[in-house]
Design a protein with these regions (language model features):
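Charged catalytic carboxylate motif
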Residues: 55, 96, 217, 295, ...
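Flexible "cap/lid" subdomain of the alpha/beta-hydrolase fold that forms the substrate-access gate
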Residues: 2-23, 32, 71, 78-112, ...
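Catalytic histidine-centered segment of alpha/beta-hydrolase-like enzymes
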Residues: 284-293, 297
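Conserved HGGG/HGGXW glycine-rich cap/lid loop of the alpha/beta-hydrolase fold
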Residues: 35-80
């Protein structure tokens, strides 16, 4: 006898109350949920896997208090955003992001991305440079660096083994939501350093993963990233990413990140023809913005306010 399926969570589960406002914006043929706080220059925050906009809750308030308009968006297919049947390649997801910038009525934004959100932030800075004022990336190397590390570094290939597991049809989705998304919680705990997110936060992420179609849409970008390696569209994307990033860039990484090795992330500055700042957080894992939100927010805000960020 099979075990009963995990009951789906309502979309309202991701519209969590706090010192921010929720709204929906249209961009690139879809509807995107955002949480917004503060007034000032726009800072757009992009979450990673297996999370949603709420991972930036600490930075939303810190940035608002520092005089910025902080907006955390749910990526396509996640949280409160539309779950479309296609459109999960990084080039299109980057157009989602820059489209949201325009829909928010701003000429440009400082884009801050973590994990998959970081991959897309790098991409947006190359594809739509006029809409990206500054770039900050956490826990993710430049896409070309990611590609070379995954293909040539045995230790990085092993560290990112979950991505290879995502290539099977349907099984990964079922595993992510089984037993009230227990695997989602386990991944967050295993990928964190000693200051892992508390049990309450992990429960929020587990519940969000149980919103219908979230698991499938969350892993579709990773399927593209692997399956396109030898396809014309993937080769074309990799060539396009040779174009240098020409905006000031802050690269943040946890020294204990078990998913993206420090060696893999470091060196991404070779793709930046602008001031590039690398900061390694000692003792933090894959989620530095949640593991030590004060240190992360301080580093980010100081850099955003620096009129001439150093290399």
């Amino acid at each position: 006898m099979t075990e009963p399926a995990t009951p789906p969570a309502p979309v309202s589960a991701v519209r969590i109350d706090g010192p921010w406002t929720h709204r929906d914006v249209a961009a690139n043929g879809a509807r995107f949920h955002v949480a917004e706080a503060g007034d000032g220059p726009l800072v757009l925050l992009l979450h990673g896997f297996p999370q949603f906009w709420w991972s930036w809750r600490h930075q939303l308030t810190a940035l608002a208090d520092a005089g910025f308009r902080a907006v955390a968006m749910d990526l396509r297919g996640v949280g409160g955003s539309d779950r479309t049947p296609r459109g999960y390649d990084p080039a299109n997801l980057a157009l989602d992001i820059t489209g949201v910038v325009r829909s928010l009525g701003e000429p440009d934004a400082a884009i801050v991305g973590h994990d998959l959100g970081g991959y897309l932030a790098w991409t947006a800075a190359v594809m739509r440079p006029k809409l990206v004022r500054r770039l900050a990336v956490a826990s993710m190397p430049h896409p070309r660096r990611w590609r070379s590390a995954m293909l040539s570094d045995v230790k990085q290939t092993a560290a990112g083994s979950y991505i290879w597991g995502f290539q099977r049809p349907w099984i990964p989705e079922r595993r992510l939501v089984a037993d009230d998304a227990a695997l989602t919680g386990r991944l967050i705990r295993e990928w964190s350093g000693p200051r892992l997110p508390d049990d309450e936060a992990v429960e929020v992420y587990r519940r969000a993963m149980c919103v219908p179609s979230t698991a499938h849409c969350s892993i579709e970008p990773y399927r593209w990233m692997v399956r396109s390696l030898a396809r014309p569209d993937g080769i074309q994307f990799n060539r396009r990413m040779k174009m240098p990033v020409r905006v000031p860039t802050l690269h943040l990484h946890g020294s204990l990140d078990p998913v993206m090795r420090t060696r893999s992330a470091a060196g991404s500055g070779e793709y930046v023809e602008a001031p590039y700042r690398w900061r390694l957080f000692d003792g933090l894992g894959h989620f530095p913005h949640e593991e030590d939100p004060v240190a992360f927010s301080t580093e980010l805000i100081n850099w955003l306010k620096d009129p001439e960020p150093d290399r």
